Amino acid sequence: MSGTKRWAAGLFIALIFMYNHIGALAQGETSAKAACVMELETGRVLFEYNARARLPMASTTKVMTALLAIENGKLSAPVTCSSNAFGVPGTSIYLAEGETLTLEQMLYGLMLASGNDAAVAIAEHIGGSVPQFVQLMNARAAQLGASNTHFANPNGLPN
């Protein structure tokens, strides 16, 4: 089989799989708790299921934590792990109480290792305390137009 025919056959098979997947969404089959599929050019909703349900954000919360840290902090600034950040449950970068890393290192721990301890240390560094940082998170979400978003902590763990 020539290279052109092989390429065309591969494209045809890919289109079949893509068409079947889109067809399943159009029929409303999903195992997700919520979903929304929109047409990019028009913004028309092609499929939605529980689209306005309030659901836990889990670790996607850390994206807002990182955004605020980058916008409001200095990457070379030292960030010290408090007793509050030490031993936070869930995924961790295993900070020791009193350990100091740069904000940049904490951000790597937050986003690459999903470090809940790093999230709390960053929140305390940027906001002064976790509750004050959460206020910043919710204010920034409102500025971005995320009017149906509510943060309760910097790491997304259930309260």
Model-identified regions with their sequence ranges:
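Active-site-adjacent loops and short helices of periplasmic peptidoglycan-processing enzymes
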Residues: I22-N159
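Bacterial N-terminal signal peptides that target proteins for export
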Residues: M1-L11
